[in-house]
Amino acid sequence: MLLLCLPASVAAQLLPAFPGAEGHGRYTTGGRGGNVYHVTTLEDSEAKGTLRHAVKQKGARIIVFDVAGTIYLKSDLKISNDYITIAGQTAPGQGICIADYPVIISANDVILRYLRFRVGTESIANGGEPDGLGGMDRKNIIVDHCSISWSVDECLSVYGSENTTVQWCIVSESLRSSGHSKGVHGYGGNWGGAHASYHHNLMAHHESRVPRLGPRPGTQEREYMDLRNNVFYNWAGNGCYGGEGMKVNIVNNYYKPGPATPNSAVRYRIAKIGVRTTAYCTNSDGTPNAWKPMEHVWGQFYVDGNVIEGNANVTADNWTKGIYEQINNKECDNTFNDQVKAEMKLSAPLETEFVTTHTAEQAFKQVLLYAGCSKERDIIDERIVKAVSYTHLRAHETELHL
């Protein structure tokens, strides 16, 4: 009865985006109540019936699919107009895959569900170094049951926004030697935001940023992030790091080292926390840049219940070796001290929008069963999940053109 007495605009905000939507982005409206556009062809053009045509329309809209298969983009697909739902679960058969160029979220109130993003190296010839799925500096976004792989830069970097959720996704096989201008690359993603939730995702086979806890200038003073019930497998160079000035829950995640994971401290890393250094916050001419407000500001973290497979000590005590011993004080302008050590550790979790929470071991099983574009998994996701499930299966980089 209380809900019926509220103004319509307020009541709408209290409706979940869809059954099963959780976390800080759960009340995203997307295209609710808007026009319905049918994708009837896999061609990429601005003609009616294409995905690009539907995305470019204005006003609230829901995009459904009458076809299945791979849409080979001819250029970046930018979602620029607010209030959109792209419902990949409506496609027949094995669903929809988007390839060759990235999809970029540049709008507010966006719902993406049951889609595959396998970008590959096609756009490098045109100067691109694409993410698989990217978006920042927006609000009200939820990405659900998507599969993202084969990026040149990060696979999934949806961050620096307000009220976001990324849930039940598979983020795998960023390309390590694909022609990126910086050389060896292959990163999982930048994750963070002002009230951002990342839960029940699988990140597998990445060189680094698994994930990178990454603030943006627009949200750096109010970064508030919940990272729980994710599975991280076979990180190589740097694993999870960052968190400069952020407030973060790191709860009940499952870390499984793989064949590419070094036999060093990174093997039992939960997160390598850092700060914005003076050099980072200063332009080449000596003037302060956009990061200056957070110079030498340490974040605060609630870390509990995380499992490092094969390391009972760090599983029992997440902080000593999983967090504290990972910090490089020299890289932090020697600002890490006993006071910082005490203040960065929260005794109670940050409040968060509701997320069904499992133990790390339960989450491992649930994620392998249900994450990704799992209405009908393709052979890529099946292979990734099997590699995580069976230690003896060796990881290998796939640099194929879809």
What is the meaning of each model-derived region?
Residues 228-389:
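Extracellular beta-rich repeat passengers
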Residues 391-398:
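Conserved small/polar residues in nucleotide/adenosyl-binding loops
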Residues 71-197:
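Right-handed parallel beta-helix
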Residues 1-13:
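Bacterial Sec-dependent N-terminal signal peptides
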Residues 172-176, 184-251:
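Long, polar low-complexity repeats
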Residues 16-63:
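Acidic Gly/Asp/Thr-rich repetitive segments characteristic of extracellular carbohydrate-active
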